[in-house]
């Protein structure tokens, strides 16, 4: 069976995120490891130890069997626990597990079926991470999805229709909400996603980003970034265009820009990054990023401000880059699709 554009784009996004955050000999904990499908990506990043956690025995066994069948590039262990239901702290302390990176690449949104499940997952993440460690992954971009849905609702009202639509359609996918409603509940907003040329629906929940941030903060995690995948790609296009091209020449144009189909599909997802504070670390928390020559103008501005600060004329709050009104946690996503 041919690999669909959706799967190729998603695999690219995971690979790119791992390339940014992984480093040699790191300890990585993969929540809902899904049969260990990403172990090769972590191996390419030269990590030292991999911990695969899944809620199902089959997921854990499949991950272990896959790892055992491959070249052993790192040590590993596989644990059957539900990150959104079980209490990790006592069990992991007994094992002495502390991770540099905790990732959740494809299941976090289902934890937002209830506040209790989301809270449990984030508390578990915090207990797993070393001070200074990162929690990273990919989730549906609920801002983009909900704004598309609201546009459908508005259009139906303008047409004088009494019923509220329960779906979003494009050439590439159909999103169907279980309940027709015009409000965005913080938890439990379920929907099904079906991509063109795929027979199966995916079940998801919308992730209310402010609630995500609040629960993470209560669990002891600092918000770093939530970014729509189209922006994530554009910000790192110089580095990642060849990588994405390797997943299929039809995904980007000759200049490395996303073609319309790729933009539409990637726009449904966001990366997320949180960090567990390290009280002994200096300087303050920053987002790891790859150098992009297209950002040289901003870097020149920062150097200018740094020179002024060295002269004693600029305070710390004055040296932040100019605010970008097109980006923000309450509305990540394509510029015309923000709350």
Swiss-Prot record:
Compartment(s): Nucleus
Keyword annotations from UniProtKB, A to Z: Methyltransferase, mRNA capping, mRNA processing, Nucleus, RNA-binding, S-adenosyl-L-methionine, Transferase
Leading EC class: transferase
Matching SUPFAM superfamilies: S-adenosyl-L-methionine-dependent methyltransferases
Region (Disordered) location: 314-339
Record-linked InterPro entries: mRNA_G-N7_MeTrfase_dom, RG7MT1, SAM-dependent_MTases_sf
GO MF, one annotated term: RNA binding
PROSITE patterns xrefs: RNA_CAP0_MT
One Pfam entry name: mRNA_G-N7_MeTrfase
Catalytic activity annotation: a 5'-end (5'-triphosphoguanosine)-ribonucleoside in mRNA + S-adenosyl-L-methionine = a 5'-end (N(7)-methyl 5'-triphosphoguanosine)-ribonucleoside in mRNA + S-adenosyl-L-homocysteine
Protein name: mRNA cap guanine-N(7) methyltransferase 2
Annotated site, mRNA cap binding, chain positions: 41, 269
Family from the record: Belongs to the class I-like SAM-binding methyltransferase superfamily. mRNA cap 0 methyltransferase family.
GO BP terms: 7-methylguanosine mRNA capping
Cellular component, GO annotation: nucleus
TM regions (residue ranges): none
Organism: Oryza sativa subsp. japonica (Rice)
Biological role: mRNA-capping methyltransferase that methylates the N7 position of the added guanosine to the 5'-cap structure of mRNAs. Binds RNA containing 5'-terminal GpppC.
């Amino acid at each position: 069976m041919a690999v669909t554009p959706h799967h190729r784009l998603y695999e690219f996004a995971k690979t790119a995120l791992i390339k940014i955050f992984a480093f040699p000999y790191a300890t990585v904990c993969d929540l809902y490891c899904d049969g260990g499908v990403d172990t090769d990506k972590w191996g390419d990043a030269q990590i030292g130890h991999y911990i695969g956690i899944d809620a199902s025995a089959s997921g854990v066994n499949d991950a272990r069997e896959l790892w055992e069948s491959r070249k052993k590039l790192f040590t590993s262990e596989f644990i059957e626990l539900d990150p959104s239901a079980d209490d990790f702290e006592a069990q992991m302390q007994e094992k002495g597990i502390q991770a540099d990176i905790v990732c959740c690449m494809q299941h976090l949104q289902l934890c937002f079926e209830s506040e209790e499940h989301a809270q449990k997952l984030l508390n578990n993440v915090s207990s797993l991470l070393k001070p200074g460690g990162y929690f990273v992954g990919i989730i549906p971009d609920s801002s983009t999805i909900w704004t598309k849905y609201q546009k459908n609702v508005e259009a139906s009202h303008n047409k004088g229709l009494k019923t509220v639509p329960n779906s979003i359609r494009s050439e590439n996918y159909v999103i169907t909400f279980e309940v027709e409603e015009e409000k965005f509940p913080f938890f439990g907003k379920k929907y099904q996603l079906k991509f063109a040329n795929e027979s199966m629906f995916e079940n998801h929940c919308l992730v209310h980003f402010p609630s995500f941030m609040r629960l993470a903060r209560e669990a002891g995690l600092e918000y770093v970034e939530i970014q729509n995948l189209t922006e994530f790609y554009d910000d790192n296009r110089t580095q990642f265009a060849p990588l994405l091209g390797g997943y299929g020449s039809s995904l980007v144009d000759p200049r490395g820009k996303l073609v319309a189909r790729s933009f539409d599909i990637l726009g449904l997802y966001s990366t997320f990054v949180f960090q567990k504070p390290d009280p002994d670390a200096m300087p303050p928390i920053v987002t790891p990023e790859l150098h992009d020559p297209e950002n040289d103008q901003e870097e020149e501005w920062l150097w200018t401000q740094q020179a002024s600060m060295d002269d004693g004329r600029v305070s710390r709050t004055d040296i932040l880059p100019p605010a970008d009104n097109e980006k923000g946690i309450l509305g990540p996503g394509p510029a015309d699709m923000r709350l």
